[in-house]
Amino acid sequence: MTLNSLPAWTALQSHFEQIRHARLRDWFAPENDHTPTRAERFTIPGGGIAADFSKNRINDDTLRLLVQLARDAGVEARRDAMFAGEIVNPTEGRAALHTALRATDPQAPFHAQISAERAKMATFARAVRSGTWTGYTGKRIRHVINIGIGGSDLGPKMVVHALHHVATPEITTHFVSNVDGADLARVLEQVDPEETLAIIVSKTFTTLETMTNARSLRDWFVARGCPEDALAKHFVGVSANPAEVVKFGIAADNVFEMWDWVGGRYSLWSAVGLSIMIAIGPEQFDELLAGANDMDRHFREAPLERNLPVLLGLIGIWYRNFFGSQSYLVAPYSEALHYLPSYLQQLEMESNGKSARLDGTFVDYPTSAVTWGEPGTNGQHAFFQMLHQGPTIVPIDFIAVLTPEHPLASHHPKLLANCFAQSEALMLGRTLDEARKVAGPGKEALAPHLTFPGNRPTTTLLVDALTPRTLGALIALYEHKVLVQATVWDINPFDQWGVELGKILGKVVEADLSAESIDPAKHDSSTTALIERARAALKR
């Protein structure tokens, strides 16, 4: 049965027509806000996070029908299949067991294998952090360079930045991902080879960007005096292809394993997170895993009506497929979460930016929305104008941390006030009559410019403090949200075939950039002209 033919989908279409013009302002009006209040009814805790869904354009009937849609689409069955280690990535014939990486049950899939690899990580991380692992001249490691791209970069970078307040001050962690040499060059300006450890992270150990940077970094070490037989003091590899790591020149003892049943964008919990463990320590890394496990248990055990990943995913579908929203915004009011929007861009769009259903037919409805964002309050001075007064509705996830992780506590009330005020302003808006009063006498022409449509939907996620545990729960919340949406849309969130064609053609174009001549029939006229211009520039 296709999505459009599910009874709950049909019922939601009728329900949407009934409430599409309803005003949140009216739903919050005192005469309508009974006990329990709307905020109390639509605020749900889970995994150390409280989610306030009350400023969304939903009522009790909306949630009831959305939850029925989840049941009709088989969300519970697919969730259970994923946790059990069944093949939920059919195009690649794989399980998706990122949840096993943080499971505490000894009966969980691959528990012994995971525990052994984590113990190896912990031993190494402690040696680096304590200074017993040294560089080739005997100096302690003070810089770690993580070289990877996509899931081998975005997750670790986001977490290390977020947990700076619990990281060791003895070691600075750098992240290099782009094949643009400027990325690596700028990091190399800051580090001393005698005190630098490189972590090369690639599932296949053949990724173009990662291996290009890794080779350049190896050459840099040698050029600055590191003997080739001492490179083992400065290079470790993380991969599902250990043989290729050794072939590159990294000692077998310096190889940490990841597995093909963990997708790259879900892999920070594995050895891909080695840079995280070195930064914050094995004990805090365990707390990160524990927080994710808290959310895993909530996702498995909470009824769908009170299940944060389920509701977050379903409300996203409500706006994407019924209101026609093209994008949604993630606005963490926390500078520590600066890289969370970038991380979620990959998690959501690489997972659910698909057009083919699981059976190979093509969807006739939208799937992943464009995910974007910026920390508050920066975004208020950049794009919030459009959110408040533009004609396009952009649903927003606000994320607020109630207690600061830094010593400048006097800043924090201002930060929280802005977050909460933005959600209220987006919901309330300002009518033309109200705008006339604000404009004042004799300024009637200004009033339309001072109106705000309001009725703009937002969800606010609250955590008491940003700790490894609450961060782990927050990340897992969005991981499971992705699965919920993929299940309803009947797509595979665990593959990424969309990245392949460009990579294949990229190799052809790269060869043409250094060729003596180009066959004009090989490319379209635009691509040929671009190559010719670049060839001329590269020869200068």
From Swiss-Prot:
It is found in: Cytoplasm. The active site is at E350 (proton donor), H381, K503. It is an enzyme of class 5 (isomerase). One of its GO terms (biological process) is glycolytic process. Gene3D superfamilies: 1.10.1390.10, Glucose-6-phosphate isomerase like protein, domain 1. SUPFAM superfamilies: SIS domain. It catalyses: alpha-D-glucose 6-phosphate = beta-D-fructose 6-phosphate. InterPro entries: G6P_Isomerase, G6P_Isomerase_C, Phosphoglucose_isomerase_CS, SIS_dom_sf, SIS_PGI_1, SIS_PGI_2. Pathway: Carbohydrate biosynthesis; gluconeogenesis; Carbohydrate degradation; glycolysis; D-glyceraldehyde 3-phosphate and glycerone phosphate from D-glucose: step 2/4. One of its GO terms (molecular function) is monosaccharide binding. It comes from the Bacteria. The keyword Ribosomal protein does not apply. Its EC number is 5.3.1.9. Keywords: Cytoplasm, Gluconeogenesis, Glycolysis, Isomerase. GO terms for cellular component: cytosol. Belongs to the GPI family. PANTHER family: GLUCOSE-6-PHOSPHATE ISOMERASE. Catalyzes the reversible isomerization of glucose-6-phosphate to fructose-6-phosphate. This is Glucose-6-phosphate isomerase.
